[in-house]
């Protein structure tokens, strides 16, 4: 059956990490039937709550093979909070859900350590979670991880692309690597399932890192720099570049009749993606249709405010943000 003692031990071990995320709006502590958070509406005329949920996908298999579980939680938080900031919202709270074959307290605590670190980076509170042990349903050493966030934005400040027009500038916020999408293809490219030891090799292209280390680089959390830009710049659209790459995600923030025109030579693609393309003999179109290609998020701003937006990004944790392309008349994404 379920190991209740292990469950109690997990909670004790994770408390120190959860405590890092608490602020004056959190009411009570761990152990309640729900997480309480006092919403401060000061500064909001008409506050609107926005929610998001996501997981980490099969990147978890890389973490399991590498036996490294302390950053995968950052990925989980990032996948959720990066989505809600696309509406202009500030994340407030986060909850995690871990399903496992066997509750190994030290491993669970490492996972939650990463979740807590992600919450600190996103300036939100980890107000609850669930660890579900599924003996007989999942292999003992395996687990799955999902997360849920709630954010707030003033109704009049919900991002709208209504004024987007030809000539607007598209800015790129670099990724840390593959982030948390496309790992089923990554595993196929390097034949990881059949040859897991390949993760411990260090291809010359990766500058001394092993393949496993490069693939496990946690998804970047863009909350703080983007919120700073939103305070001073008329941002017309934000896209989180996840599964589906450029072709699926950039159009989600485009106004009808507008297209994103991007020169492929301007995309600063890290060596990891070049290694993947070469090893898997993957077409350029499929790479841009699957992976972020080194761009984790894009912001569309008026041309006259592009320099100001870049200055803010450079001063707030995104020193490598750059101009990626422009808005033109048309539909979708034009990579030329």
Where are each of the predicted segments found?
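Glycine-rich phosphate/pyrophosphate-binding loop regions near the starts of catalytic domains
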Residues: 16-176
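Short, acidic Gly/Pro/Ser/Thr-rich loop/turn segments
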Residues: 7, 43-44, 56-59, 154-157, ...
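Residue-level signature of catalytic and energy-coupling elements of molecular machines
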Residues: 3, 54, 167, 240, ...
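Short loop/turn motifs at secondary-structure junctions
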Residues: 88-90, 185, 234, 320
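Hydrophobic face of alpha-helices
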Residues: 11, 109-112, 183
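Short, acidic (Asp/Glu-rich) active-site segment that either coordinates a divalent metal cofactor
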Residues: 144, 157-210
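Glycine-/charge-enriched secondary-structure boundary and capping motifs
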Residues: 16, 107-125, 138-145, 195-199, ...
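N-terminal amphipathic/basic leader segments beginning at the initiator methionine
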Residues: 1-25
């Amino acid at each position: 059956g379920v190991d209740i003692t292990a469950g109690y031990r997990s909670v004790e071990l994770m408390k120190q990490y959860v405590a890092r995320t608490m602020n004056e709006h959190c009411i009570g502590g761990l152990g309640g039937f729900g997480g309480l958070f006092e919403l401060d509406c000061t500064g909001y005329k008409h506050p609107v709550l926005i929610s998001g949920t996501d997981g980490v996908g099969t990147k978890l298999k890389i973490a399991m093979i590498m036996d490294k579980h302390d950053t995968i939680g950052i990925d989980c938080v990032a996948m959720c909070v990066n989505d809600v900031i696309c509406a202009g919202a500030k994340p407030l709270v986060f909850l995690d859900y871990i399903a496992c074959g066997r509750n190994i307290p030290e491993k669970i605590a490492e996972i939650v350590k990463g979740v807590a670190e992600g919450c600190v980076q996103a300036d939100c509170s980890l107000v609850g979670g669930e660890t579900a042990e599924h003996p007989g349903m999942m292999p003992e050493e395996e687990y799955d991880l999902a997360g849920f966030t709630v954010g707030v934005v003033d109704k009049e400040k919900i991002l709208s692309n209504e004024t987007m027009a030809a000539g607007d500038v598209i800015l790129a916020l670099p990724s840390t690597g593959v982030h948390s999408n496309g790992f089923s293809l990554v595993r196929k490219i390097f034949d990881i399932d059949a040859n897991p030891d390949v993760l411990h090799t260090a291809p010359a292209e990766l500058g001394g890192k092993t393949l496993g280390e490069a693939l496990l680089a946690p998804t970047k959390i863009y909350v703080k720099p983007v919120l700073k830009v939103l305070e001073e710049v008329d941002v017309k659209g934000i896209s989180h570049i996840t599964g589906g790459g450029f072709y699926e995600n950039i159009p989600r923030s485009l106004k009808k009749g507008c297209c994103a025109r991007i020169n492929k030579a301007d995309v600063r693609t890290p060596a990891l993606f070049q290694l993947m393309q070469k090893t898997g003999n993957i077409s350029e179109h499929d790479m841009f249709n699957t992976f972020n290609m080194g761009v984790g998020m894009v912001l569309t701003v008026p041309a006259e405010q592009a320099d100001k937006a870049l200055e803010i990004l450079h001063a707030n944790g995104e020193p490598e943000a750059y101009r990626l392309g422009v808005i033109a008349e048309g539909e979708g994404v034009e990579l030329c």
